[in-house]
Amino acid sequence: MNKGPRHRPKFLSKKGKKLRIMVAGSSYTSYQACINSLCSKQILEAETEIDPLKAHIDRILEIREFNADILEDEFHVDLTVIEVNGFGDKIDNSASFEVVTHYLESQFDQALIEESKIKRNSKFTDTRVDALLYFIAPRGHCLSEFDLEAMKRFSKRVNVIPVIGNSNAFTEEELKNFKDVIMKDLKQCNIKVFDFPWDPEEDEDEVIEDNKRLWESVPFAVSGGVSEEDEEGYQRIVKKFQWGTFVIDDPAHSDFLNLKTVLFISHLDILKSITKQTYYENYRTEKLSNDSPSNTSLSLQKQNSIVANEDKRSVNGSERTETRSSIDQSEMRTNVSDSTKSEELKKINSIKVDNTSSLKCDSYGNTKTKTNQLNCEQIGLEVISPKEFPHRTTSSRNSLPNNTTKELEMKKMDDLSHERYENLPFYR
């Protein structure tokens, strides 16, 4: 009879190796009791009592974390158990996939953000999930569509380890047949679970044989129980029934010891390495490739244009101020000139109104008024009539017409004195 794990480390770490495992499965699998038995302490609490008044209400899907420091003779592990409470307990469980997948990807996002920083945080806590224990209900026929879809989605982001809960419900032959059906369904649906990889060129023969034996045990058939001493004084995890006692950590009864060895001793580092080098790198590649270069270039061009516009605003701010001041000054001058012109136009219009209101004829038949003359004197204009224009000799502009008139008068007098009437138009 196997009393414990086969793999024993050479030394134990004082702080314990960090391990983060997620547990998903319906409440009918009794996964809480199994996890408590693996950790040898009470971590998860199963709901043994159900309120009849709330039995018809769907349970809320919750993701809860529990920490436990597990120290035994063979290992020391700083364990974090992530429980998906209420998984698969609803009538419609379609939204459960997205909740779990979003949680797994969120842990990758945190690592990606920290990795892209120029100055990284030395105290950054890696929260990526190293393994997911998917508990399968002991139906005995085949995997449900829900189980197949769940493992297919989760296997893209984490190491999925299928586990049969409450395996004590099967006989030895029934359990073997159920395992064969599960592995056949996984293969037909191309669902990749943790397959205990080995390298024939690097790994020793003993390691290869152990990995093959563990792979043949998948899915692991386990149950939960309580610890008590047997007749020989060994601490055993048992589950008592009326027909007898089911020894959980007996390899002849269940795969409990194999699962415990895989998680805490033999494959702990391998699980963490595959999480970082395979699942995280695949997610990182998908995340960066989804950001198309065209969108990235457009966003960069937009940012550059915004920066250029800001620079132009800062550089040309003074020029716009000077231009605006010059425009204001020109507008002021224009307003002054416009106001002056408007005043003159008002005066001229007032003159026209006065002329039309009170018209008088002078001795030459011209229309003159005192107001007209007064307004003309105010604006500096000289108003004369056509009849008095030839008789004006004071102005230099009238010198040419006055001289011409005198010559014509003298010529007329000469023609009359010599009786040259043909030159006089009024004698023809």
From Swiss-Prot:
UniProt subcellular location: Cytoplasm; Nucleus; Forespore membrane
Functional note: Septin-like protein involved in the correct orientation of forespore membrane extension during sporulation. Binds phosphatidylinositol 4-phosphate.
Region called G4 motif, residue ranges: 165-168
GO terms, molecular function: GTP binding; GTPase activity; lipid binding; molecular adaptor activity
Location of region: G1 motif: 25-32
Organism (species): Schizosaccharomyces pombe (strain 972 / ATCC 24843) (Fission yeast)
The entry's keywords: Cytoplasm, GTP-binding, Lipid-binding, Meiosis, Membrane, Nucleotide-binding, Nucleus, Sporulation
Bias (Polar residues): 290-307, 326-339, 392-405
UniProt family annotation: Belongs to the TRAFAC class TrmE-Era-EngA-EngB-Septin-like GTPase superfamily. Septin GTPase family.
Name listed for the protein in its UniProt record: Septin homolog spn7
Subunit structure: Component of the sporulation-specific septin complex composed of at least spn2, spn5, spn6 and spn7.
GO cellular component, one term: membrane
Membrane topology summary: Peripheral membrane protein
Top-level taxon of the source organism: Eukaryota
Gene (UniProt): spn7
GO biological process: cytoskeleton-dependent cytokinesis; protein localization; spore membrane bending pathway
Transmembrane segments: none
Pfam assignment, any one: Septin
